[in-house]
């Protein structure tokens, strides 16, 4: 009999976590399949970042189990670029698992072209705009043998127009280099545009109170009926006006 979770990258079973006497996650079950983009939304402080930290292995659950298949990389709100390294050198950090120097250089050039930063490979992070820095960060986590991306509000520090561009950029990159993604955001638009599945978390201690499967293929425009319908459903679940 075939395992019902065959092809799954992440499996959480009855996961609970607390900080001292404060319960943050309660008996949470979740399966994330290979190649799926799962976006989590919920009230501020409900435990979304804690869940990412559990998935990354940075912290361990108080109870329950987490099974992970593949190499995990994390993207945070603030990029993790090394200021003393150039664009090319920062991307090369993600390629250290490739032992062949020729293959490593070929991959580095391909990634620079993929994020449309040709001619910027010798620039330092302080010489780039916020959006350009996040594109370098995306290239770095897509480099080499990464399988799972954990993304904690990666575009929230950017202005609205740049956020829109970065959503399109991420969708384009995932088309060309598919990965399993777990993405945390407070942005309802972002969730509806990027996700295959949206998880709405409850107030703390968080449980999954609603799952929304978005049928239209990525990438999606903001005017896509599936995006608009998903936004309405998310807002309704969060108790916000539509």
Model-derived regions, located:
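The feature captures the beta-strand-to-loop junction immediately N-terminal to the Walker
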Residues: 41-43
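A short, proline-enriched helix->beta-strand linker immediately N-terminal to the Walker B motif
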Residues: 143-147
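Conserved ABC ATPase signature
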Residues: 124-128, 132
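ABC-type ATPase nucleotide-binding domains, specifically the catalytic core motifs of the NBD
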Residues: 60-61, 89-105, 114
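Conserved ABC ATPase "signature" region
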Residues: 102-120, 172
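Hydrophobic anchor residue at the start of the ABC signature
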Residues: 138
């Amino acid at each position: 009999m075939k395992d019902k979770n065959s092809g799954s990258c992440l499996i959480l079973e009855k996961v609970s976590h607390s900080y001292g006497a404060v319960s943050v996650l309660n008996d949470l079950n979740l399966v994330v399949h290979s190649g799926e983009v799962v976006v989590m939304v919920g009230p501020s402080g409900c435990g979304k970042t804690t869940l990412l930290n559990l998935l990354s292995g940075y912290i361990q659950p108080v109870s329950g189990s987490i099974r992970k298949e593949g190499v995990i990389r994390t993207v945070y709100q603030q990029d993790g670029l090394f200021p003393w390294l150039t664009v090319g050198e920062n991307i090369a950090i993600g390629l250290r698992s490739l032992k062949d120097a020729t293959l490593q250089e070929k991959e580095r050039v391909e990634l620079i072209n993929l994020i449309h930063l040709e001619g910027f490979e010798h620039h330092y992070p302080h010489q780039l705009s916020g959006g350009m820095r996040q594109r370098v960060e995306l290239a770095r986590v897509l480099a080499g043998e990464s399988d799972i991306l954990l993304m904690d509000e990666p575009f929230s520090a950017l202005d609205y127009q740049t956020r829109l561009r970065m959503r399109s950029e991420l969708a384009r990159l995932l088309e060309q280099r598919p990965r399993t993604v777990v993405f945390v955001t407070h942005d309802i638009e972002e969730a509806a545009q990027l996700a295959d599945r949206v998880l709405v978390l409850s107030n703390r201690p968080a449980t999954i109170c609603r799952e929304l499967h978005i049928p239209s293929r990525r990438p999606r425009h903001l005017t896509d009926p599936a995006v608009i319908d998903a936004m309405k459903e998310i807002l309704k679940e969060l108790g916000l006006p539509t």
